[in-house]
Amino acid sequence: GZAZKGKKIFTQKCLQCHTVEAGGKHKTGPNLSGLFGRKQGQAPGFAYTDANKGKGITWKNQTLFEYLENPKKYIPGTKMVFAGLKBZTERVHLIAYLZZATKK
């Protein structure tokens, strides 16, 4: 299904900087466990930029869909170097995976 396809995308494009499992380590980017419904810039123990702390959004399907298209446009000053996923279908699949994989 969508989440299976999303896992492949995550493995190819996100895994080098992010973990998803509860209690997973921060890498270059924060651990994403508990992502959905969390305010942005709130993973405990991760050093965020002021830009990431100041946007004031809550992560959910729509905000992730917009963010993942072009992270630097959505949050100017973010240190996430990922250029974004322009393909809408890939973003839907990735978000489906994240929704499953980041549940606590």
Swiss-Prot record:
A Pfam family that this protein carries is Cytochrom_C
| One GO CC term on file | mitochondrial intermembrane space
Which amino acid positions bind heme c, per UniProt?
14, 17-18, 80
Q: What is its main location?
A: mitochondrion
Modification note: Binds 1 heme c group covalently per subunit.
As for subcellular location, the record says:
Mitochondrion intermembrane space
Alphabetical keyword list: Electron transport, Heme, Iron, Metal-binding, Mitochondrion, Respiratory chain, Transport
List the molecular function annotations (GO) for this entry: electron transfer activity; heme binding; metal ion binding
In terms of InterPro entries, this protein maps to: Cyt_c-like_dom, Cyt_c-like_dom_sf, Cyt_c_1A/1B
Family, per entry: Belongs to the cytochrome c family.
Q: Which PANTHER family match?
A: CYTOCHROME C
Q: Sum up the protein's function in the record's words.
A: Electron carrier protein. The oxidized form of the cytochrome c heme group can accept an electron from the heme group of the cytochrome c1 subunit of cytochrome reductase. Cytochrome c then transfers this electron to the cytochrome oxidase complex, the final protein carrier in the mitochondrial electron-transport chain.
The record makes one more remark, namely:
The amidation states of residues 16, 21, 52, 70, and 90 were assigned by homology with other cytochromes c.
Annotated protein name in UniProt: Cytochrome c
Origin organism is: Cornu aspersum
Query: What are the top taxonomic ranks of the organism?
Result: Eukaryota, Metazoa, Spiralia, Lophotrochozoa, Mollusca
